[in-house]
Amino acid sequence: MRNINIAIINYECGNIHSARKAFELALTELDISGSVTVTNDPEIIFKADKLVLPGVGAFSECFNKLKSVKGLSESITERVHDHGVPILGICIGLQLLADKGFENIESKGLGWISGQVENLCPDDKNLKIPHMGWNEVNFKRDDGRFSDLNGEDFYFVHSYYFNAKNTIGTDFRILIWTSSIKLYTERVMEIA
């Protein structure tokens, strides 16, 4: 079995400790040889087999911090787009892949996935924002990757959602599969 090198991208907007611990536990539990490195060094990112982009905070602030580290967003883009390295965006980490976001101010995103991050405004005014609590997740289209998760409960804490352009309706997306995946969940270790 080959060694898997996972790089968790540190741009000062993520719950880095929890992400690192979750991936270290997943490697151990699944008996996979590998390493988990927290980094903002483009050279380490170029050597990684898998990338993780966590994120906590406001969209525009996180985007600006990501862009402020010299060569960071360019190295991530090259690894994902040119070399096909998979990336897992967690919370705002996935949202940053959108064209733009509207948290506090309108802000440009990386533009990797068509769509925008919008305020969660339910039709039912009795529903509270931020959306917090356990909810059942149902997949509209499942190619089998997530069949074990359909109907499972996940914990949500958010006020914004990724409105992908290739979908319609009022449901909000918690997972968009392209070269990335995102789950709003505190159960990352259990799922892994």
For each predicted feature, which ranges?
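N-terminal beta1-alpha1 cap of cysteine-dependent amidohydrolase-like domains
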Residues: 1-85, 105, 116-118
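Short glycine/proline-enriched turns and hinge-like loops at secondary-structure junctions
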Residues: 102-105, 148-150
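Acidic active-site catalytic centers that drive phospho-/nucleotidyl reactions
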Residues: 10, 95, 158
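Gly/Ala-rich beta-loop-alpha elbow adjacent to hydrolase catalytic centers
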Residues: 89, 93
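Short glycine-enriched nucleophile-adjacent loop
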Residues: 98-100
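Glycine-rich nucleotide phosphate-binding loop and flanking beta-alpha elements
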Residues: 15, 58-60, 94-96, 161-163
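Amide-donor transfer/coupling interface in amidating biosynthetic enzymes
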Residues: 45, 81-82, 115-192
